[in-house]
Amino acid sequence: MVENRPILKFLTHLILIIGIILICFPVYVAIIASTHSSAAFSSGTLPLLPGKYALENYNTIFGDGLMQRGLPNLWPLLMNSLIMALGISIGKIIISLLSAYAIVYMRFPFRKTAFALIFITLMLPVEVRIIPTYTVVAQLGMINTYGGMIIPLIASATATFLFRQFFLTVPDELLEAARVDGAGPFKFFKDILLPLSKSNIAALFIIMFIYGWIQYLWPLIVTTDQNHQTILIILKQLIVESLQHDPQWNILMAVSVAAMVPPVLVVICMQRLFIKGLIETEK
């Protein structure tokens, strides 16, 4: 039984509050900075209260303000990032579900070896695979295409492992009952395993969506056309431009806030399923 000591309760809440402040304060500063003019930062002070230039700053980044700097409009950048994140997350989940299903429920030679080889890929850093992967993508003519941005990243050993562990917890009686009812392998997968995996799918979707959204190195390598670049690439260009010329920190922070909105919305909309999926995965 856990003792309910007031001092322990106070310390627990204090640590949680400090952690929340450390995490949320930079985000708060970015939001506040996006509402001020560039002159507000020239004095070296950091404003902590909202300014009156929010509409002007966001109209600049969503209008023609970035195009005047030789950068593309923000809407296509957000769309490119969204397409890449959705393609990676959905692709990873589909491939991992099918892989885990085959490893757990199908009998074929070297089944355990196949899973071991999949799991070993976790030990390969991304940098080791960059050059051979880029060579294959270039030879297939997939540079500056959504396929070239997404397909090399849709295999996930982590998701395959998590789905495999979950499928191993499914009672064998369900499989036997499905066979008695005349259900084939696909029907068992579609009507029984998929509904049971809903929470796990939601949890992994959020993780994989954020993974796809924050990709920087790979899209930077396989895209030379601004029409296919993601928002993080342009954000880096804005940072370099601000350091080399007149700093426009308000515009930079406005773009940063815009880049944070989609993943935050995904987490907010699916947080209950996300937490439930993590709990079920731990079981």
Region roles according to the model:
Residues 2-4, 8-283:
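A structural signal for multi-pass alpha-helical bundles of membrane permease subunits
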